[in-house]
């Protein structure tokens, strides 16, 4: 509702609810996804552990955004190495690619932008100091992001110490959602688990 009528709608095509949206302000949305290969999609996904993720992003020509800035090269495919750990980062890369395409960037420019991405504190941020590696991802966690962080930590080598706190603003299902994260974590190979907070203990 807040979008400029001349703007571009970019949606996750793997979301069952969003994929049903066929038109916004008379325009077809730009979809990206892994399971649903309509529009912009990624395949050949290779998890590189804490070094990031490599994948191939396909910029489908029939899903190209028609703007004054649109370039002839926007529909190219390219292989990119995302320098942030976690396979979930592929979705962020595809969303960024869709935005870049809408702004008229070439595939090479989009690739360069993704490969130059840097994390910020408390957002999937890796700190290396005194022989220790810390995965700092503690800002405003939710069940999906918590499981993604656990997956990233699970790929690390050496002794793994997992420190988790409560997740807030989850509503009436907060206890069940904490239990689900705990059950998910139990399937991973952690050496030490420390929990902080009334809902996490």
For the regions a language model picked out, list residue spans one by one.
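Acidic, Mg2+-coordinating active-site environments of NTP-dependent enzymes
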Residues: 1-134, 158, 183-186, 190-192, ...
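Active-site beta-alpha connecting loops in nucleotide-dependent enzymes
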Residues: 120-122, 138, 142-201
């Amino acid at each position: 509702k807040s979008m400029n009528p001349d703007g571009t709608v970019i949606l996750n095509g793997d979301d069952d609810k969003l994929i049903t949206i066929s038109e916004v302000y008379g325009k077809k949305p730009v979809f990206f996804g892994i399971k649903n290969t309509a529009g912009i999609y990624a395949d050949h996904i290779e998890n590189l552990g804490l070094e990031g993720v490599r994948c191939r992003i396909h910029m489908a020509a029939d899903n190209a955004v028609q703007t004054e800035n649109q370039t002839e090269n926007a529909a190219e495919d390219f292989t990119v190495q995302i320098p942030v750990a976690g396979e979930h980062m592929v979705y962020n890369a595809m969303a960024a690619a869709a935005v870049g395409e809408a702004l008229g960037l070439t595939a090479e420019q989009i690739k360069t932008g993704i490969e130059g991405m840097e994390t910020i504190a408390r957002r999937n941020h890796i700190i290396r100091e005194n022989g220790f590696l810390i995965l700092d991802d503690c800002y405003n966690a939710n069940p999906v992001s918590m499981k993604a962080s656990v997956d990233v930590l699970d790929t690390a080598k050496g002794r793994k110490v997992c420190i988790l706190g409560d997740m807030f603003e989850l509503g009436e299902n907060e206890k069940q959602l904490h239990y689900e994260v705990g059950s998910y974590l139990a399937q991973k190979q952690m050496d030490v688990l420390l929990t902080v907070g009334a809902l996490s203990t």
